[in-house]
A protein has these predicted regions:
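C-terminal helical cap(s) of enzyme catalytic domains, especially alpha/beta-barrels
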Residues: 68, 170-176, 229-254
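Hydrophobic faces of well-ordered beta-strands that scaffold small-molecule active sites
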Residues: 3-9, 48-50, 75-79, 97-99, ...
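Catalytic cores of alpha/beta
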Residues: 83-92, 143-153, 199, 203-217
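Conserved N-terminal beta1-alpha1 strand-loop-helix module at the mouth
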Residues: 1-77, 88-94, 175-178
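Histidine/lysine/aspartate-rich catalytic loop segments that bind and position anionic ligands
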Residues: 135-189, 193
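Glycine-rich phosphate-binding active-site loops on the catalytic face of alpha/beta enzymes
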Residues: 98-106, 157-170, 216-235
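Glycine-enriched alpha-helix->loop->beta-strand junction motifs that scaffold or abut catalytic
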Residues: 44-46, 70-73, 91-97, 131, ...
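N-terminal active-site wall of soluble small-molecule enzyme domains
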Residues: 49-128, 145-146, 160-168, 183-189
């Protein structure tokens, strides 16, 4: 079974905002997240991930509606648990919602959502969005308690935060095996609880193959590295290269197909 690839196009909007933050609607505003979504599909993406943050640092609300209208790929809408974002989600009606933590100080999402500690605040949001027909994912650290709380709250999916794993691989430190073990245990627990297990954050062309050691993964959500690679080879080719690196995964072995 091939892993599904969700392509996060937020940082296409980041590049646009670097020049057109005050004029995102200008005819000159580029690059276009809509073009990126179209190229992602041509490159083999299975879904498109977008995150409209409260501070609108990259994706704008208008982008979300236009992207959804322009592509027939399912939209995975990342959002903080705020009434503003709930209202946007109810208007946008994406196929998937991924609830994430969000602070203005962070450069990007730096850790998993504390479903255990925020259970009572998150539960009504999950219920509201599911009632409107959306499939819910929780972006969580690979922690057994967070997986169990996500299943208890009724989320159909979890996305395992792979940032610590990615840092350990890049820095060639001894914690690499420990981080993979955390991911393995979290994936097994999610599978046992009947929750779809996805993963994302910090995954790149150099480390993606190491996630073959983690069983029961369904989809990887990858963004920044694809946008960075696209500067050299174009967006469609960057997606296709990542797609090729994700072939041959065996979810039951947690390793390369044998």
């Amino acid at each position: 079974m091939n892993l599904l690839l969700g392509v996060n196009i937020d940082h296409v909007a980041t590049l646009r905002q670097a020049r057109y933050a005050l004029l995102p609607e200008s005819p000159n505003a580029e690059p276009s997240p809509i073009d990126a979504a179209e190229d992602a599909k041509l490159g083999g993406a299975d879904s498109i991930t977008i995150h409209v943050r409260g501070d609108r640092r990259h994706m704008q609300e208008a982008d979300a509606y236009r992207i959804k209208e322009a592509t027939d790929l399912p939209i995975n809408f990342e959002m903080g648990n705020t009434q503003e974002m709930i209202d946007i989600a109810l208007k946008l009606k994406p196929k998937f919602i991924c609830l994430v933590p969000e602070t203005r100080e962070e450069v990007t999402t730096e850790g998993g959502l504390d479903v255990v500690g925020l259970y009572n605040e998150l539960a009504p949001t999950v219920k509201t969005l599911q009632k409107a027909g959306m499939i819910i994912s929780m972006f969580v650290d690979p922690d057994i308690h967070q997986i169990e709380a996500s299943a208890k709250i009724g989320a159909e999916m979890v996305e395992l935060h792979t940032g610590c794993f990615a840092n350990a691989v890049a820095e060639k430190v001894n914690s690499r095996n420990a981080e993979l073990d955390r991911l393995r245990k979290a994936a097994v627990r999610g599978h046992d609880l009947g929750v779809q297990v996805n993963a994302g954050h910090g995954i790149n062309y150099e480390n993606v193959h190491e996630l073959y050691e983690v069983p029961y993964l369904k989809e990887l959500n990858i963004g920044h590295t694809i946008v960075a690679r696209s500067v050299r080879v174009g967006f469609q080719q960057a997606v296709a290269e990542m797609r090729a690196l994700m072939q041959g995964y065996n979810p039951n072995l947690g390793g390369v197909e044998r």
